[in-house]
């Protein structure tokens, strides 16, 4: 109860660090939300009117560390947004009735096939590929919505954050939406437990569950394992982390 209330209050004020927090009036325009000494902007990851995402996605990408290629989470770039005081990455998945969605997908394919031109033929092929994957591998269709809330000091140019995100996501083949003019609606719909308020026609897009999982944030801080037999490796930042190689690092009593 109290923890949930505190979390919602902190989300409302975009303040997850200070011990004491205060609420401020909101000033909202098409580009951002101003609250006290902070300005926030909500970035919708996908524009449903013009979906610019790669046809194939992986759960990770690679970076170079000391001339060595290392895998990182696909959206690990969220850790490096310039001037950002707070970053919230909302990941929403809605599981619809599968038979109904497959029926709608078949109707959509037939509609595209009835108008033979290059763009419609590409759409038909894409739908066929999805249907083949679902039939062969028993995959699940989901509706998803991803958005970023970036908070910066009020005297900071938030366009720097926008340029940074557009540049980094473009390297992954994703062009974030430029039509996020409904800032207040996106902010309110992103509240914990309020995701069902997102507009089904405008804010959600249909994809396979595997592809949606690839866009979820999977990074976490690596901690040393509890074991008396410590073998130290370093993480990507060069911080030593103790790794147990016995496979029994549950409690000390399990080790002999």
Model-predicted segments: where are they?
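Core alpha/beta catalytic barrel or barrel-like domain that forms the active/cofactor pocket
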Residues: 179-186, 239-247
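N-terminal pre-Walker A segment at the start of P-loop NTPase domains
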Residues: 221-243
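Generic "edge-of-domain/loop-turn" microfeature
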Residues: 155, 248-250
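Conserved small/polar residues in nucleotide/adenosyl-binding loops
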Residues: 253-256
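Extended, folded cores of ATP/NTP-driven motor/assembly subunits in large transport
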Residues: 1-217
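Short glycine/proline-enriched loop/turn "hinge" motifs that connect secondary-structure elements
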Residues: 136-141, 233-235, 245-248
């Amino acid at each position: 109860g109290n923890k949930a209330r505190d979390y919602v209050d902190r989300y409302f004020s975009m303040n997850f660090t200070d011990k004491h927090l205060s609420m401020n009036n909101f000033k909202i325009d098409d580009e951002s939300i101003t609250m006290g000494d902070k300005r926030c902007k909500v970035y919708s990851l996908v524009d449903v009117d013009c979906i610019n995402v790669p046809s194939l996605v992986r759960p990770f990408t690679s970076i170079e560390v000391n001339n060595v290629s290392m895998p990182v989470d696909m959206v690990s770039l969220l850790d490096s947004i310039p001037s950002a005081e707070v970053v919230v990455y909302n990941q929403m998945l809605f599981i619809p009735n599968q038979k109904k969605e497959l029926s709608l997908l078949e109707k959509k394919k037939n509609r595209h096939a009835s108008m033979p031109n290059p763009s419609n033929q590409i759409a038909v092929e894409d739908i066929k590929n999805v249907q083949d994957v679902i039939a062969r591998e028993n995959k699940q269709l989901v509706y998803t919505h991803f958005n970023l809330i970036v908070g910066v000091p009020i005297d900071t140019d938030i366009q720097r954050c926008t340029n940074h995100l557009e540049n980094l996501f473009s390297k992954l083949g994703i062009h974030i939406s430029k039509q996020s003019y409904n800032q207040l609606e996106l902010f309110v719909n992103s509240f914990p437990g309020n995701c069902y308020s997102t507009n089904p026609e405008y804010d959600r897009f249909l994809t396979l569950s595997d592809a949606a999982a690839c866009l979820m944030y999977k990074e976490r801080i690596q901690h040393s394992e509890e074991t008396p037999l410590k073998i130290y490796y370093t993480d990507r930042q060069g911080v030593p982390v103790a790794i147990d190689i016995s496979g029994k690092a549950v409690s000390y009593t399990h080790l002999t």
